[in-house]
């Protein structure tokens, strides 16, 4: 994936202006409400963003996003350790959608179309890398 300097700067804006843990936990909470079948993998979750199990999983998602952010030019090789987990890759896309909604809610007017496009590109790269690793 080719990144322009502007796209990288826009992804950095999102990364630097958000509380990663809170945004991801809220996105997970939204995921479990909007797409309840995704809870199949998380039988111990009550689905609320403040729940300790959701917070713990949000931390794992934040770690994966941080890894991708730190290696934005070459994400896929850094996700090799996820191989063999056998999770439905579509769930990553659904979470990415919920994350976009949460970012829009959090950043309000700062979540411009340009910012949204750059973040969407980033999340698509992450989803693609995870999907290949989990198959």
UniProtKB/Swiss-Prot annotation:
Gene3D superfamilies reported in the protein's UniProt record: Globins (1.10.490.10)
An example molecular function term from Gene Ontology annotations: haptoglobin binding
Residues engaged in binding heme b: 57, 81
One Gene Ontology cellular component: haptoglobin-hemoglobin complex
Further comment: This fish has three hemoglobins: Hb 1, Hb 2 and Hb 3. They all have a similar Bohr effect.
Role of this protein: Involved in oxygen transport from gills to the various peripheral tissues.
Quaternary structure and interacting proteins, as annotated: Hb 3 is a heterotetramer of two alpha and two beta-3 chains.
Protein name (record): Hemoglobin subunit beta-3
Organism: Somniosus microcephalus (Greenland sleeper shark)
Organism ancestry: Eukaryota, Metazoa, Chordata, Craniata, Vertebrata
